[in-house]
C-alpha cells in the first residue's frame, strides 16, 4: 500500500513563540506609560533597589512603582468614526451636567454653555484626550485652590487649565483640566496653533482630578450623571 506523502509546506509546522511575537503580545496586553510617570516609577524602583535587603523597603518601593505604573498608564483608544461626535476627554464618572459660563480667562463671554464634568479617581487613567478634531486657538492656565475635585465649587475655585479647540466648521469646544485635593500638577502639551485629531492625547493631571467640557450652544448631551466614560471613545454629544 502506498504511503501518503508527508506534507512539506510550512502550514504543517508546529507553531512557535518567537521573541518578537512574545514582545508583541506583551505590548498589546500591557498599556504603555505616559512619559510624565517615568520619574515616579523610577523613584519607586530606586527605593526597592537601595533597600533590597530590607523586606519592607523592597515591598514598599515595588508597590509604589506598580501603583504609579497603573496611574500613569496610557492605553490605546479608538475614537468613533461618527461625524460630529464630541468624545469624553477623560476616563472617569460624569458628576455634573449643566450649563455654565466658560472660564473667564478665555474671554468667550458670560453666556452659559452646556457643560459635562467628569470626575477622575486615583484608579482612572489620567491622560486627557482631545474631545474633537480641530485647531487649538487658546490655552489658558489659572492658579487656584486645591479643593476636592468632586465638589461643584471646584470648577470655579480650583487651579485649572483651559484648552479651546475650534473645529473645521467653526464650532468651539473647551476642555478644562481642574486640579483636585490630591492632584496638584496639571500637565498640558497643547499649544496655540496645534492641530489635534479627535482622541489625541494632549495632557495629564497627577493623582485625581476633574475635566469640564464646555459644548457649543444648542448641543444636547447624550450621557447621564453617574455614567462611566472612556477617554477618546465615549460620545458626550454631537456637534449641532
Curated annotation (Swiss-Prot):
Protein's UniProt keywords contain Amino-acid biosynthesis: no
Site (Cleavage (non-hydrolytic)): 208-209
Alphabetical UniProt keywords: Cell membrane, Decarboxylase, Lipid biosynthesis, Lipid metabolism, Lyase, Membrane, Phospholipid biosynthesis, Phospholipid metabolism, Pyruvate, Zymogen
Chief localization: membrane
Chain positions found as Pyruvic acid (Ser): 209
Pathway where this protein functions: Phospholipid metabolism; phosphatidylethanolamine biosynthesis; phosphatidylethanolamine from CDP-diacylglycerol: step 2/2
EC number from the UniProt entry: 4.1.1.65
Changes after translation: Is synthesized initially as an inactive proenzyme. Formation of the active enzyme involves a self-maturation process in which the active site pyruvoyl group is generated from an internal serine residue via an autocatalytic post-translational modification. Two non-identical subunits are generated from the proenzyme in this reaction, and the pyruvate is formed at the N-terminus of the alpha chain, which is derived from the carboxyl end of the proenzyme.
Cofactor(s) the record lists: pyruvate
Localization per Swiss-Prot or TrEMBL: Cell membrane
InterPro entries registered for this protein in UniProt: PS_Dcarbxylase, PSD-A
GO terms under cellular component: plasma membrane
Superkingdom of this protein's organism: Bacteria
Catalytic activity field: a 1,2-diacyl-sn-glycero-3-phospho-L-serine + H(+) = a 1,2-diacyl-sn-glycero-3-phosphoethanolamine + CO2
Cofactor binding, note field: Binds 1 pyruvoyl group covalently per subunit.
Family designation: Belongs to the phosphatidylserine decarboxylase family. PSD-A subfamily.
Described function: Catalyzes the formation of phosphatidylethanolamine (PtdEtn) from phosphatidylserine (PtdSer).
The protein's assembly and partners: Heterodimer of a large membrane-associated beta subunit and a small pyruvoyl-containing alpha subunit.
Protein name: Phosphatidylserine decarboxylase proenzyme
Amino acid at each position: 500500500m502506498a504511503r501518503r506523502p508527508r506534507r512539506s509546506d510550512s502550514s504543517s509546522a508546529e507553531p512557535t513563540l518567537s521573541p518578537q511575537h512574545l514582545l508583541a503580545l506583551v505590548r498589546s496586553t500591557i498599556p504603555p506609560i505616559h512619559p510624565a510617570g517615568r520619574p515616579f516609577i523610577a523613584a519607586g524602583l530606586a527605593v526597592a533597589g537601595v533597600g533590597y535587603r530590607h523586606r519592607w523597603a523592597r515591598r514598599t518601593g515595588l508597590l509604589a512603582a506598580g501603583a504609579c505604573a497603573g496611574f500613569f498608564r496610557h492605553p490605546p483608544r479608538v475614537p468613533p468614526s461618527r461625524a460630529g461626535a464630541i468624545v469624553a476627554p477623560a476616563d472617569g464618572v460624569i458628576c455634573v451636567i449643566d450649563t455654565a459660563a466658560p472660564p473667564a480667562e478665555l474671554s468667550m463671554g458670560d453666556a452659559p454653555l452646556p457643560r459635562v464634568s467628569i470626575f477622575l479617581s486615583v484608579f482612572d487613567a489620567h491622560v486627557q484626550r482631545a474631545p474633537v478634531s480641530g485647531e487649538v486657538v487658546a490655552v489658558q492656565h489659572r492658579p487656584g485652590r486645591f479643593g476636592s475635585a468632586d465638589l461643584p465649587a471646584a470648577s470655579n475655585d480650583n487651579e485649572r487649565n483651559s484648552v479651546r479647540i475650534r473645529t473645521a466648521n467653526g464650532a468651539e469646544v473647551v476642555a478644562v483640566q481642574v486640579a483636585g485635593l490630591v492632584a496638584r500638577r496639571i500637565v498640558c502639551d497643547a499649544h496655540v496653533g496645534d492641530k489635534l485629531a479627535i482622541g489625541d492625547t494632549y495632557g495629564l493631571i497627577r493623582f485625581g482630578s476633574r475635566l469640564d467640557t464646555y459644548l457649543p450652544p444648542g448641543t444636547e448631551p447624550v450621557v447621564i450623571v453617574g455614567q462611566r466614560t472612556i477617554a477618546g471613545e465615549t460620545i458626550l454629544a454631537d456637534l449641532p
